[in-house]
Amino acid sequence: MSTMNPDYDYLFKLLLIGDSGVGKSCLLLRFADDTYTESYISTIGVDFKIRTIELDGKTIKLQIWDTAGQERFRTITSSYYRGAHGIIVVYDVTDQESFNNVKQWLQEIDRYASENVNKLLVGNKSDLTTKKVVDFTTAKEYADQLGIPFLETSAKNATNVEQAFMTMAAEIKNRMGPITAASDSKPSVKINSSTPVSANKGGCC
C-alpha cells in the first residue's frame, strides 16, 4: 500500500504511434472507454486518456497518449516521447506500407525516447481477414528479431486490445520493478555496498 498516493502504485505513460489511419485512436477508445466508431475524426494535437488497471495485486494508472493526426505532417517532436515508459507501434494489417513504415517509427523511438523504453508491435484491423496483406508470421518474425512483443488486434471487435495494453503494462512493471513509480514500497532488487558488482557480470541496462 502506497503512502504517497492511495490511488495507484504505478503511473505509466504510454504512447501510440504509427501511420495515419491505422487505428490508433480506435484502439485508445476501445481500451479506455470500450467504444468503437467507424467515423472517428482525426484531430490535430495530442490527446490522451487514462485508465487504471490491476496487475499482480498492484494498481497501475495508464496515461495513454495518441498522436491525434500529427503523424500526417511529421510534426511529432521529441517532447511527445519524453517521459514515456512504453510505446506501442501500430500498423494496419490491410496496408503493407504502414507495416513497411514501422522501421521508420522505430528509428523515431531510438532518436527521441529514453533508451530503455518498452516497445510493442501491434497489427490492427485483424477483423478484415479478406483484405489482410501483412502476414502474421512475417510480422512476428520481424518483432522477434527486434526482441519486442507482437500482437494482432481489432479495435472494431475488441480482439486482443485489452491484452495489448496489459502486455505493455506488464513489460514496463517487470522492468521498473525495483523503482516503483508512485510508491517507495519494497524494492524487489537492490544493489548496496555489501553486493559488489564485478566486471564480468555484464551490463544490465
Curated annotation (Swiss-Prot):
The UniProt entry, under InterPro entries, shows: P-loop_NTPase, Rab, Small_GTP-bd, Small_GTPase
Q: According to its record, what are the GO cellular component terms?
A: endoplasmic reticulum; Golgi apparatus
Covalently lipidated residues (S-geranylgeranyl cysteine) read 204-205
Q: Where GTP is bound, by residue? A: 18-26, 36-43, 66-70, 124-127, 154-156
Task: For this UniProt record, give its keywords in alphabetical order, as a comma-separated list.
Answer: Endoplasmic reticulum, ER-Golgi transport, Golgi apparatus, GTP-binding, Lipoprotein, Nucleotide-binding, Prenylation, Protein transport, Transport
Q: Which gene encodes it?
A: RAB1A
Q: Which organism is it from?
A: Lymnaea stagnalis
Protein name in UniProt: Ras-related protein Rab-1A
Q: Which ranges belong to the motif Effector region?
A: 40-48
Please note every region of biased composition (Polar residues): 183-198
